[in-house]
Amino acid sequence: MTAAGWPGLLGRLRAYQESELLFAAVELDMFTHLGDAACTVEELAVLAGASTRGMRMLLDALSAMGLLVKQDDRYACRQEISALLTCHSPENKLNAVRLIRHGSEQWRKLAECVRQGSGIDTGRFVHDAELNRSFIGAMHEIGFANASAIAAHFDFSSRKRLLDVGGGPASYSIAILQRYPHMCATVADLPLTIEASQEYIARYGMQNRIDTVPVDLYRDAAFDIDTGYDVMLISNVLHMAGSEENGALIDKLAQLLDAGGMMIVHESFIDYAAPTVERAMFSLHMLVATDGGQCYSYGEVGEWLAAAGLRDICPVEGVFEQPSLLVAVKP
């Protein structure tokens, strides 16, 4: 290896240190302890129940990263960081941080997952109530901006009834119904997830317009869901499962759609010939996090839609930076 190549590789090998630093700071609730104040090492050590020695090193590292401002013997949190990592902030992304940390633990088994071709201990989100709630919270923190972008792009003025498949915190239903007050929606997801869905629906005052249906999309032979939907959104569901399971799912869902109804698939589509780093990494994350999931191409998902009898299948560009939307119509 050349001398020029080693420094770059070394930087990649050490990249985990910055993420572990952030995970530790969040676990110790450092940003909430700081709030809008400027505190000393000793004050923060008491608040976090930590040693002054360790706290000083942690705070200096956070300052070196540019997340804190150090002046004399006091540390303060930058305003933009405080908004994201303080528990009292309505904009906080703490559930997302915890989800990413959980993912980092799964990635430590990457070599084993590559050997066996699937993830290890992948069912925790389904059965662990605390982990599921954190996951759903993260989906809302990450997804609401995407939901708003979809609501702004599509014209739903002639649509009345939305089926939000695997809707989690109902972010997409909420964003669409906020923009189109004549519409109503149904969120279909796992029973444990639906408990969290109902909390988000109530938080946004949508109880009279959004209902919920508990369903296991990949295991239930038939869905206890009414027909009569003229728009259906399948957002960030298909990457969780294998090709055969997804084909069967699309076929069952298409039967719930009215003639002329629109099916929107929101996914992290991948170009196998030239995948971006982000999509290649996310597909690999699905290897460690699921039994058979991965990112799929436009062509693969398009084949499932066509096999289910849908037509006018086409990608939608310009909403997101990377390929993310595919639309089809039921004839």
Q: Where on the chain are the PLM-derived regions?
A:
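Conserved Class I S-adenosyl-L-methionine-dependent methyltransferase catalytic core
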Residues: 8-27, 32-38, 47, 53-160
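Alpha-helical subdomain
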Residues: 1-70, 156, 165-331
